[in-house]
Regions:
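Short non-domain terminal segments
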Residues: 24-25, 35-37, 45, 55, ...
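A short, charged, amphipathic alpha-helix used as a generic interaction element across diverse proteins
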Residues: 77-88
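Negatively charged, low-complexity tracts enriched in Asp/Glu with abundant Ser/Thr
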Residues: 1-42, 66-71
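Short intrinsically disordered terminal tails
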Residues: 1-2, 89-93
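Intrinsically disordered, low-complexity regulatory segments enriched in Ser/Thr/Pro
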Residues: 42-79
Length: 93
């Protein structure tokens, strides 16, 4: 969660709406786990980012409510910020 909070802070400093969210996952009435991710959005561009146990970031990119990709894995925070900002520039430029 620490890496996702850092990411959200950086993105907000760049003028991108970003926050870390937690959604519980249940099987019946039993809590299985918490789905913790960073949601970020600017215009019609949206990213959902998870920080995996393998120390990788998993990105899902949606444009105008259409999923574009959901299996991009990046190793570092700077790669994630670069991917998000360059994608926003391409689609919202």
């Amino acid at each position: 969660m620490k890496e996702l909070k850092k990411l959200a802070l950086i993105l907000r400093a760049l003028g991108i709406t970003a926050k870390v969210e937690s959604e519980p996952i249940y099987f019946g009435s039993e809590l299985i786990s918490d789905n913790i991710f960073c949601f970020c959005k600017k215009g019609d561009v949206r990213f959902d980012i998870w920080y995996e146990e393998t120390n990788e970031f998993e990105l899902h990119f949606t444009f105008k409510d259409t999923l574009v990709y959901d299996t991009l894995y990046l190793d570092s925070l700077i790669q994630v910020v670069s991917e998000i900002t360059s994608t926003i520039s391409k689609f919202e430029g």
